[in-house]
Each structure stands twice: as C-alpha cells, then as structure tokens.
Amino acid sequence: SLDTTGNVDLTSANVKAGSLDLNAGNKLILDTATQTTHQVSRDGATSDKTTLGPAANLNVAGDASIKTGGDFQQNAGNLNVGGNLNANIGGNWNLGVQQTGEHKVVQRANGVSDTDLNSATGSTVNVGGKSAIGVGGDLTAQGARLDFGQGGTVAAKGNVTFGAASTTSTINANSSGDQGNRSYAETRHGADQALTGTTVKGGDTLNVVSGKDINVIGSTIDLKKGDANLLAAGDVNVGAATETHVYNSRETHSRSGVVSGTKIASSQDATSTVANGSLISADGVSIGSGKDINVQGSTVVGTHDVALNAAHDVNITTSQDTSQSSTTYQEQHSGLMSGGGLSFSVGNSKLAQQNQSSSVTNNASTVGSVDGNLTVNAGNTLHVKGSDLVAGKDVTGTATNIVVDSATDTTHQAQQQQTSKSGLTVGLSGSVGDAINNAISETQAARESAKDSNGRASALHSIAAAGDVAFGGLGAKALLDGAKGPQAPSIGVQVSVGSSHSSMQSSEDQTIQRGSSINAGGNAKLIATGNGTPKDGNITIAGSNVNAANVALVANNQVNLVNTTDTDKTQSSNSSSGSSVGVSIGTNGIGVSASMQRAHGDGNSDAAIQNNTHINASQTATIVSGGDTNVIGANVNANKVVADVGGNLNVASVQDTTVSAAHQSSAGGGFTISQTGGGASFSAQNGHADGNYAGVKEQAGIQAGSGGFDVTVKGNTDLKGAYIGSTADASKNSLTTGTLTTSDIENHSHYSANSAGFSAGASVGVSTKAVGPSSVSGSGGVTPMVFQNDSGDQSATTKSAVSAGTINITKPGEQTQDVANLNRDTTNLNGTVSKTPDVQKMLSQQADTMNAAQAAGQTVSQAIGLYADYKRDAALDAADKAYKAGDLAGAQAALNEAKGWMEGGASRAELQMGGGALIGGLGGGSALTAIGGAAGAGTSSLLANQAEKISKSVGDTTGSSLVGNIAANVAATVGGALVGGSAGAAMASNVQLYNAGNDSNNQTSNDVFASLSKKVAQAIAMTADGKAGVWNGMVNVAGVIVNLPNGGPFASPGDPGYVSLDGLKKPYKSGTSIGPDAEFWTPVLATLGLGGKAAAGTGATTTSADAATVGNGALKTASGDLSAAGNAARTQPYGNGASASPSPGTATAGSSGANAQLPTANGGVAAAGTSSATNVGKVVIDGKIGGQLEARGWTQQEVQAVVNEGPVGTTMDNRSAGKTPDGLPRNDSASVYGSKSGYVVVNDRTGEVVQVSGKNDPVWIPDSRIKWK
C-alpha cells in the first residue's frame, strides 16, 4: 500500500509487490530514463548515442488498485498485474515512448557523412485478470502494448486514443574529389519515418468508452474471444497513421582531356507517404458514436455480428499512399566528339532531361462479419467509398441517405528533353562520302524501326543501306581506277560549322476509380429513410457492386445506380531546328555548302472509360423508390427482379470515348557549290492524324432469370440502348408503366492518319551527292514520297429491348411510341466497334516509312538501271562480235536482246515494274500500292525515250538542259500518278531520275544499236533475197548470150569458160549452193573487146559487184548491140528473176529483191573481177571509199545526211585514171559537206564520193585545197 499526497516517481525503478494499493495525490510517473554519451574517435568521427537506462517496472503478482489525483505518465515503463486491475486516474493517462538512437558524424578526406538513426521503445500494460480503468482526462497510448487478459472496461471522460509512435532517421552525406582531369561532387539526403502502432489485446470482451472521441490510428485491437465494444459520445475514428519517406540527391561529374571534356549533372527528389491502417478484430464488434463513425483505410471484422451505429454519419472510406518524384539529367560535351557516322566534331553539345511523376493510391477499408451479420445505421448519411462491406449472413445499411461509390487513384507523369549542338564538324563529302554516310544512317534507322515494330520501314531502310554500301563501293573502285568525266564519282573532306536544337515535352494524367463492394451470404438491404425533406432519402451506388442471395434497395426518394468514369489524358509536343555552312575539298576541287531544317509536331488524346455498377442477386432483387429509379451505366441481375418505382424508371447505357489528334511537319533544304558544279535540294513532310471512338463496352439493363420480372413504374420508363430482359416464360414477365419510350445508341469508331511529302533537287555540272534528286549530274526533279494513308471506320448500334411478357401502359393518352414496334428480342443487342489505335505512334511510323521508301526507291531504281545498262552493253558487244564473225543470225538475236534492255525496252521495264511493286508495296503497305508502284515504274521506263524528247524540246526552248531534264521528270511523275496514284508517281519519278536520267551511255548505246541494226539488216538482205536475185538475174542474161546463133563472138561449147544453158537455168533461192555443174564463171559475161572471146575465170561470182558492166557495144545480138538494155537498166533495181530483153532499149523487172541491180551502161567495159561503183542515190560510193567509211567512223546514212544538209566548202577532183573505178581521169569541181571535224568530198558531175575524213577526229588535218564557206 502506497499513499501520498504528491507525486509517485518510479523512473527507472523496479518495484515488485504481491498486491498493490497505490494512491498518489498527484502524478504517478513510470518512466524509463535515457542516457546520452558523446564520443570522438581518433579519426575525428563524433558520436552522440542515446540509450535506455534501467527499465521502469511496476510488477504486481496479485490484484492492483491504482488511483491518482493527477496524470499517470508512462514512457517506456512497464505495468504488470497478475490479477485484476482497478485504476482510477484523476488526470490523463499517457503511455508514451522513449526515443533512442545515435547521431554520428564522420569526416573523411573526400566528404562528410552525417547519420541520425533512431527507434522508439513503448510502454506496456499486462493484466492477467479483468480490468476496470477509469480516466478523468484523456487516455493516450502511442506505440504501446496493452494486454487485458480477461477483458474489462477502459473508460475516459476525455478522448481515448490508440495511436502510433513516430521516429525519423536521417542520412546526410556529401563527397567530392579531384583526380587530375576528373572531378566529382555528390550529396545525399534521406529521411525515413518509422511508425510503431499501439497493440491492444485481450482474452475476453473489452469495452472502450469515451466521453469524447475514440481514435484508433495505425493501431490494433485484437481480442482472442469476446466482443470489442467501442462507445463514444463524440466520434469514433478508426484510421491510418501515415509515415513519410524523403530522398534527395545531387551529383556532378566532369572529365577533361587534351581534346575533349564532359560534364554530367543529375538530381533526384522523391517524397512518398505510406498509410498504415488499423485493425479491430474480435468475436463480435460493436461501435457506437454520438456523432460520426469514420473508418479510413482500416479493417473492422468480427467472427460473428458486427454493428456500427452513429447518430450522424458513418463514413467507410480509403486512406491514401502518395508519391512525388522529380529527376533531372544534364550532359555537356565540349571539344572533340563523334559527329555521327564517320565524322567527328569540335564544339559543344548539351542534353537536358526532366521527369516528374506523382500518384495517389487508395487503400480500401473492410468492415464485415465472417459468420454473422453486418449492420450499419447512420442518423444522417452512410457513405461507403472505395471500400468493402462483407458478411457471412446479412448486410443491412440504414440511413437518411446512402452513398456507395468509388475512390479515385491518380497518376501524373511529365517528361521534357532538350538537346543542342554547335561547333565544327569534319566528315566525308562527295558522292562516295555521301553514300557511306547514308549507309550508316540507314542502317541505324533500320534498327530503330525494328525496335518500333515497324517491319516495313525496317526492310526499306535495309534495302537503302545495302544500296548505299554497294554504290559507295563501286564509286570507291572507280576512283581507284582513275575514272574521269561528268559521271565520275567524287570523294572529299568537308568542314562545316553549324548548330541544332530540339525539344520534346509530354505528359499523361490518369484517374482510375476504385469501386466499393457489398457482399452478403444472405440478404443485402440498403434503406434510405429520408428526413422529411423532398430531396432526401436517396440511395446512390456508383461504379460499385452489390452481391447477395437477395438484394433490396429501398429509398424514400431516388435509387440511383450509375457508372463512374476513368480518364486518361495525354499531351505532347516537339520541335527541332538546325543549320550549317561548310567548305569541302576533294576530287571535285573546293566547294561550299549550306543547309537548314525545321520540324514541329504535337499530339493530344482524351479517353473516358466507364465502370458499370452491378447489382447481383442469386434469388431476388428488389428496388423500391418513392421517386425516380435510374439505372445509368448499371446492371441489375437476379433470378427474379421486382421494382416499384414512384417516379420514372430510366435505364441507359453509357459509352467509352476517345478523342485523339496528332500533327507532324518538317522541312529542310540546302545547296552545294563546287568547282565542277553545284546542286540544291529541298524536302518537306506533313502528317495529320485523328481518331474518335464512342462505344458501349457494357450495356446497361435489368436482367431476370427464370423468376422473371415484375416492374411497376408510376411515370415513364425510358430505355436508351438498354434492356429489361428475362430468361423466364413470358407469363412471368410484367412491365406496368405510365408510358414507355425507347431509343438506340449509335456506336462509332473512326481514325485517319495521312502523311505526305516530297523531295526536290537539281544539280549542274558534276554532283557531289549520292542520294536525292540532286545526286544526278546535270539533272533534277521532284520525287513525291509514297503517300501514307491508314484509316478505319466502324459503326454499330446498341439497341433497346424488353423481353416477351405483359406490358401495361397506364397513361395511354401520353404514350407517344407504338408499343407494337417495341423490340422484344434481348439477345445480341450491343453492337461493338474497335477502339482507335495510337494515332501519334501511327504518324511517327508513317514518317519513318515514307523516308525509308524514298531512300529504298532510289536504290532499287538505280540498281536496276545499272543492271539493265550492263545487260544492254553486253548484248551490243555480242552483236558486234557476231556481225564481224559473219554470224548474222546471232547478231540479230543479240540486237533483239539489247533492244529489250535499252531505255524504253521491255526487259528493263519489267524489272523496274518489279522494283516498283516491291517499294510501293512495302511503302504503302497494301496490294493496291504495290500495283500502283509497278504501274508507275513500268510506265516511266517504257516512255523513257518520250521523256528524253520532252527534255530536249524544253531544253532547246529554254536554252537549259537542266530545265529540260526537270520537265521530263515532272512529266514522268504526272504520268506515274495517273496510272498508279502516289506510289506510281514516286516510282515513276525514281525510274526517270535515277535510271534514265542517270544513264550517261544512253545516246552512245542508241547510236551503236542503230548502226549495227542497219549493217546486219543490209547483210541479211544481201545474203538472202539479194543473193538469189543476183544469181537468177545473171542466169537470165546468160541465157540470152548463150542462145546467140553460133555463139557469136562469145564462148563456144568447146571453150574453157563455156557454161551450158541447162546448168544456168536451175532455180536459185536464198542459201542455194552453186555446184560444179552450174558454176557461173566471171568471164562468161566479160569480153576482151569487140568480138573477143572470154578467158576462163577461176572463181564463181558471189555478189552483184563482181558482175561486169555491160558497156556500149560490148554485147551484140544478131541485129545489133544490147547497150540499150544496159542503159535502161542503169538505175532500175532488179530482183529475183530480173531479165534484160533482147530488144534494144528495153528492160523488164522481175520480183523484188534486196540490193540486186543490173550494171550501169555508162563507162564502157569493166575488167573481169573489178567491183563497179554502187549508186546509193545522190552520191556514189566505190569500193575503196566504202572500205574507209567504217574505219573513219562513218555510215552510209551519215554520209547521205551531211550531203543533204548542203555544202560547207568547195575543192577539185583531179584524180588520175589509176584512182578511178572506170579508169578515166577526173578534172571536175567537187563540194565539201559536214564540217572541219568531219567532212565528205563529192564530185559534182558524177556524184562520186572522193574523200572522207575521220569523223570527230581532233587530230585529222583537213585537205589544204578546200575552200571553206
């Protein structure tokens, strides 16, 4: 027994008693003292350590009675009573903690570490028997452990608080260092709060009574058996204690070298809060409040019945965890750095990134009974927010108004990034350098496209990269081989000065609704009684679920079953710009260049996602409302549904919606000027995308099972895309309503993404580019990109219906719709549409695909052109070799092949069509664009010669071949668009620019082809029809001669040169072999003079040139000579079977044959075997001159062409008799045709070609006797 008028101070005391009767006139102090020590180590580290002293213990083996006139102060003290405890505290009973820990500061060479680590030791109360505790003031326990062995009562006139003790530990550190060319600095700050809740235990019923409020915050009341009864005159708060965690860091790192330096700075700031809820658990739980009961993020659960009764409100809601974080990163490089690809830069580059995020996450409360009933009564409002009510049996909620709804989780994320670069860059230039640089960039682009799941763009980038590698390799080889000329590749080094900047911002804000639930094994009943005012007495269940065997919703006014809405809002924007000027030096000399580009874009999206409310009853669902019942975005499902609505019944579905839009545009251009030429280019792209979706995800309605529905509505029943359905027989379905209206909801989904672009360029002289329209020397054009178009439209209907059954309209005079037309089929009512895709990603992929298709399009067209050129040149070479070898059939076959591979040829066009289909298909992503690409490429290839004519015509008109070439490209592009749309236009432009426009050997090949074609045609005709015609003509003439009486002055049958008529008159055809019995010796038609006899020849005549001229008087008939026949035959071509009539002055032509002519009559008699002159029209070319033509670069057509253009000079033909074909001297005037670089001299009298010079031979010395005009 201890009785005192003052304080009883048992600090760090250890008191033991068999029983205790303690009466303190003032305070009772049961504290455990703390002690603090300070230490300094040898290395300068300091430590301040706080520890507990001897524990304060008041140990009573039996019963204890404690009475105080003042407060009972217990900090880390221990009260242990083996029997019953009877306590009467006159003041407050504070069960607190003592904080211990260590504050340590360590000084190091590179920084300081400052740590403060703390923990709390709470008080304990352990009672073996029953407890009867009265507190005149407040009972406050923080981090305490209370064990009331056999239960009892704890009552306080003030507040009863079971709370959590809090301690905070901090870490602060900084360090820095400088190691020559490297330095760093780091700071760290961390603060972590730790909570220790109060734990109340008992072996039997425990009553906690308060004259004010009861607060269970972050703490636990856990009884092994018995009930936990909490009764307060004020509020009962069962909630969460919140701990806070903070982390901050700053870092800087720098490195400097001889040629470069790097600085990196980063920071991180993060704050989070975590809510630690409370728990009340017992066999049964009863909570009564004179005001409000608030359960926040906590659990109240009983094995048996649980009851919450409040005079005012009952709020069962959530607690929140929160987080906020912000990070920054800055990186700066200076000096020498990579410039991308094979280039390097000297300058500065900066990267700055910022990220912010925040979130609020709700923690649900749970109130319920495992095996019993849950009853919640509120004098005013029962509000269940984002939480759960559960009972093994029944759940009953009664209040003036009842709200069961959702709590809102939120997230926010934002990112910003800025980059900038300026300085001097050194890299490769020229066409070879450009190809190498582009190969590297296209390879990188292919990887990025693959990461972005854009397979088409990745494939196209890979094609372009492979082409750039090949063209770069070919160009490099050509340089090593010493290639010269306007199409020769170039390489050099470029030094440029420039700057670039880019920025990007994006953000996303989301809200997610966490609905509530009510789950009962038996019945779930919610009753809103109202308080007599018109607007009270409502039940609202939003985005939540009620599940029970039977559900009853009874409201004095309205029953509102409605949806909640999640939202997702995104915003983004980007911009970039750059410019540079440079100087290059390389195989094309010195050059200058400049470029500029700019881009910007934005995107926004707003989405709303609906969460339906669900009322599910395995047996009966009953809804009774004095006013309206609204089932909006909600579903009532039960075996039987009964509804009695005093107002209107509104059932409506709600739509998820998404609205999105994105835009992206870019433009850039540049020029280069070198000593050998220059070029300029420009490109632009623009893309726009939008999407709009509205669709019912879950249709609203009332669905009954085999029990049917019985719905009575005093006012109007309105169905908007909703239903009242049943699987029962129609006899069990009844709808009685004042009036009935129905309507459908139209769902739709639309998206459209379109991207377009073009590149334009031109070059004069020698181009130093390998890619783009300005890469073709002396040409240019506009190349459209393959238009990108992705779109989709869907529509569907969410219909209204009422299952078959009885429909009674009680206000027929107000009924506006014909009930007979009502849809009674409640199956498949909700027509759905697909949601729209991410239009911003779609737009990004479209831009990537367009760029890839353009790069690959040039590669494919150029590669096919090179292959076709090779095939063409090889075929022409084969034709030439076959012609010279006398294989005319082989020559013609090779020429036919060459024609197919020439510009405008079918073989070339077929390959270009294949390439166009490949690029068009990959670029446009459809069979239609593949067909369009093929059509455009094929058309452009087949019409290459027409495009060349356009180029020449426009070029001649404007005086600029470049303008002509651009006009040809535009024409090809337009033609491609007409036959193949955008893909056709792009492929047509590629073929014209990178194939035909890039074919420097086209004209030369055309000339070679024309020359060879004529030679082969002439030779074929000569050796075929011409051979037969000449022989048969000779046979007929010989027949005249042989049939002369007595042989005349000619050969007689005994002469060696005699040939019988029978042998001569065999029919000769193309390819006929002349045998020994029909040899036609040359001397047969020749004479040695008047009356002479021909000597036997030694070879058979094989060409018309070997036939001797029939001169005046050379051949005589019985009545005169045959000179008239020769005169008549001077210019008349004779074909197969041509004959000269024995009558003077006449000649008859036979069937037509090639190159078969009878000799001329002028000029006397030619010697046997001598080739006579062949008249080709205006001019005559003898054998000697004919042999010189090809060697000096002429064809007969070209000789005739320059003669037709008129003379350019005069001279004289003074050839001696030994140099003329007829053996007669010349002393005639002559005209000169052509030019000094290639001319022809023609005798004005005879038309003979006297002389030809080397054609286009710069070293040829013209005849000094020529008088030039």
UniProtKB/Swiss-Prot annotation:
Residue segments, region Pretoxin (PT) domain: 252-991
EC number: 3.1.-.-
Summary of subunit composition and partner proteins: Specifically interacts with cognate immunity protein CdiI, which blocks its tRNA nuclease activity.
Biased composition (Polar residues): 508-518
Protein's name in the database: tRNA nuclease CdiA
Name of encoding gene: cdiA
Entry's Gene Ontology molecular function annotations: endonuclease activity; RNA nuclease activity; toxin activity
Alphabetical keyword list: Endonuclease, Hydrolase, Nuclease, Target cell cytoplasm, Toxin, Virulence
Biased composition (Low complexity): 317-336, 491-507, 1135-1155
Residue ranges, annotated region (CT domain, has tRNA nuclease activity): 981-1269
Record carries keyword Transmembrane helix: no
Entry function: Toxic component of a toxin-immunity protein module, which functions as a cellular contact-dependent growth inhibition (CDI) system. CDI modules allow bacteria to communicate with and inhibit the growth of closely related neighboring bacteria in a contact-dependent fashion. The C-terminal 282 residues (CT domain) acts as a tRNA endonuclease on some (tRNA1(Tyr), tRNA(Asn), tRNA(His)), but not all E.coli tRNAs, and inhibits growth in E.coli.
Impact after mutating residue 1263 to A: CT domain not toxic in E.coli
Similarity comment: Belongs to the CdiA toxin family.
Alphabetized Pfam families for the sequence: Colicin_E5 (PF12106), Fil_haemagg_2 (PF13332)
The keyword Transferase is assigned to this record: no
Short sequence motif named ELYN CT motif, residue ranges: 992-995
Localization in the cell: Target cell, Target cell cytoplasm
Ranges in coiled-coil conformation: none
Source organism (scientific name): Burkholderia pseudomallei (Pseudomonas pseudomallei)
InterPro entries reported in the protein's UniProt record: Colicin_D/E5_nuclease (IPR038233), Colicin_E5_C (IPR021964), Colicin_E5_C_sf (IPR038234), Hemagglutinin_rpt (IPR025157)
Region (Disordered) residue spans: 317-340, 491-518, 1124-1155, 1207-1231
Stretches the record annotates as FHA-2: 1-251
